[in-house]
């Protein structure tokens, strides 16, 4: 019997944090974290009455090492538990001379009958300084500050005071508009002007051209200097078309000199070559091996392994995929003709041994899609701000001018001036979007159109209804039935009846009278 493996318990700290709130902590965990074990209680209560600090008890051997103990040098004593003394710098005493003694006048005691008003008398002040000091007052003009209007207080007898406060005047505001332009070498802006007479401002480039016309005053002798064309910084080079690419997303990979492991797919001696025309081979190759349901979430970009029962034989949807037990993931390559090829390596399980091993050949399934050719270069336009392609709309220019030839020209086919034909409406009615509705006898809707008698040309009032209604003349040829008068009862006689009987008309039958019984 195998012994169960012992599972180590979690740390004491983590157990205490999780079980403290629920109150399910084990006693050993609770005592160890809260320090309430027997050893903790002995140290806690024993240290309160016994102090072993001065005995030198420790975990060492007590021999003092090789050289033994050395007595510590004596030094100043240290008071334990006392308040530290703060040393402050001493103050340097300064000598102060005797101050001038001022004469003090004696004040008579104040009698109760004396007045409480103290008269002010002029007294000569005592000079404190030995000599007179000349004082020069310098007047500096003070800038005028904001004037503050004093409020007007209106007070009437028997009413409260009214304080009228005037609003502060608003100083005029000066607005200054400035334009700052910073040169950014990473951003190039194209500024062009419309070829018209005018002025262009706020332009980043100024083009000065001469020889645009005008009148020259003076001699016509000018010096011709041979100039060299400076290429524009906005010019670009058109690259030559690149050769056809070998893959849709080419990657730069280092070529390995070693021999590739495995069998090459194009080896016809070892691998059977089968070309597949079914488009399901690209994304759903499992449907070519066996019948299955479609799962839109699953992408078959992996190696598929198919397991078949030994006692059953299933015909695959495609005969080329018979006995396929393994189909690899897709591999993309190019053919010498320039086509993109999708390849999958399959393994057949044709022969099965008694041990269960399957033996079969390898098959290379491939499908050629298309070729990847270089596209024609597209002429690109410069990105920037320019006004050369702007559309100028002028209302006066868009007006229509009619040139009427007043003079008579016998050879011209124009309309005569001031002719009434100019007032005719040449609009052409277009019924391309109309619908012709012709009703039958059963579902016919009739509308009454009133007619107004007037001396002018006849006009009609047509009711506005939904859809299009076409009025057309309708003639019906109905046969007129002439009924015989007077109505004579008809006696029906069967000529083919040999019995000689007859049938009376129901109107000739005698009516039954209802009689009352007494």
Swiss-Prot record:
Record-level GO cellular component terms: host cell; host cell endosome; host cell Golgi apparatus; host cell nucleus; viral capsid
Name by which UniProt lists this protein: Minor capsid protein L2
Stated role: Minor protein of the capsid that localizes along the inner surface of the virion, within the central cavities beneath the L1 pentamers. Plays a role in capsid stabilization through interaction with the major capsid protein L1. Once the virion enters the host cell, L2 escorts the genomic DNA into the nucleus by promoting escape from the endosomal compartments and traffic through the host Golgi network.
UniProt GO molecular function: DNA binding; structural molecule activity
InterPro entries the record matches: Late_L2 (IPR000784)
Family: Belongs to the papillomaviridae L2 protein family.
Location in or out of the cell: Virion; Host nucleus; Host early endosome; Host Golgi apparatus
Post-translational modification: Highly phosphorylated.
Chain positions of motif Nuclear localization signal: 1-10, 510-517
One of the GO biological process terms: viral penetration into host nucleus
Region (Disordered): 238-262
Biological source species: Human papillomavirus 12
Entry keyword DNA-binding: yes
Superkingdom classification of source: Viruses
Quaternary data: Interacts with major capsid protein L1. Interacts with E2; this interaction inhibits E2 transcriptional activity but not the DNA replication function E2. Interacts with host GADD45GIP1. Interacts with host HSPA8; this interaction is required for L2 nuclear translocation. Interacts with host importins KPNB2 and KPNB3. Forms a complex with importin alpha2-beta1 heterodimers via interaction with the importin alpha2 adapter. Interacts with host DYNLT1; this interaction is essential for virus intracellular transport during entry.
UniProt-listed HAMAP family: PPV_L2
Keywords, in A-Z order: Capsid protein, Cytoplasmic inwards viral transport, Disulfide bond, DNA-binding, Host endosome, Host Golgi apparatus, Host nucleus, Host-virus interaction, Late protein, Microtubular inwards viral transport, Phosphoprotein, Viral penetration into host nucleus, Virion, Virus entry into host cell
Chief place where the protein resides: virion
Paired cysteines (S-S): 19-25
